[in-house]
Amino acid sequence: CGNNCQLTVNTFSDGGRLISGNRCERPITGKKDDGRWNLYEYKRQLILGYKPGENKRGRIGLPLCLNFWELYPFWHTFFTKLGFQVVHSPMSSRKLYLEGQGSIPSDTACFPAKLAHGHIEFLAKLGVDAIFYPCMTYNIDEGLGQNHYNCPVVAYYPEVLAGNCDCLKNTKFIYDYVGIHRPHDFTKKMTAVMEREFGPIPHGEIKAAVEAAYGEYERHMKQIREKGAEIMAAARKEGRRIIVLAGRPYHVDPEVNHGIDTLITQFGAAVITEDSVSQLADPFKTTVLNQWTYHARLYAAAKYCCSQPDMDLVQLVSFGCGVDAITTDETREILREGGKLYTQLKIDEITNLGAVRIRLRSLFAALEEQEET
């Protein structure tokens, strides 16, 4: 949790402590989330578990923001296989946000996008040989929707960073348009990009790195689905309620979600993600054009929830997200038709979780009342 709430701790002569002024229950013994019931924490540890590798051809910096929360295993594997040392920016924090705040051109962007400026500032100061952050119109096609676009902010925010971050004047910033949804074309594109930026690299090496990257991405997503299934099975064995905390890959970032995942586990529920169950839903038709990869997962997860009596969905919405004006209505309708309650939590840079706690208490109280009747 990145909130860093101010606490008053009175320590007595017998070793006892009285904690006051706190806005959450994390300091209280027995309330801390150990990660056992939290798929968000598992996803964070997966990303942080990748090692930089050897520096044979240079150091590449990857910003841990937006779609890199999902694609980091892909790009890390690609570059390390080619002999690059891969370093990433740290998990977001208030300090990191403030460091990049001066280059944010518009206050209308969502908070996760604003955080990207701080990540770029960090990598530029780190002195890497290049920062790699490609523009990506498409995502990998998971077969859940009519198309597989990234939202405009995720797809093209590197253009905004290139035009506004002064720190990039002295740092190589690679933000070419690439498409991982077409492996053959992707290999050709990356061969050209790597030759332009780092000199000739044998095509065979590029091809092997691409194959390894796709394999690692599949392994990463499989790990998430398997861990989700493990948490669900354990929760059902103990009679815990299961909450699908649905959002985007970058909502795993503690500075973005403000510890809401941990807060839900403190209510005694297990927390899983939309991408851990989206493949389990039977095909169905939405009333809106289903063309965004992340949103297609959201709809599929909501549909799957409707078939599971012990599972409910809470949607995280970043303030300023234009596409969520559509997804919230569609998700609400899917859950309503399935007889489920819809809970939306709108989040931005404000860290006070008082209102969120009230919403969640109301949700769990309503669910208990439903069970009793």
Mark where each language-model region is.
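An N-terminal assembly and electron-transfer interface module characteristic of large anaerobic redox
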Residues: 1-373
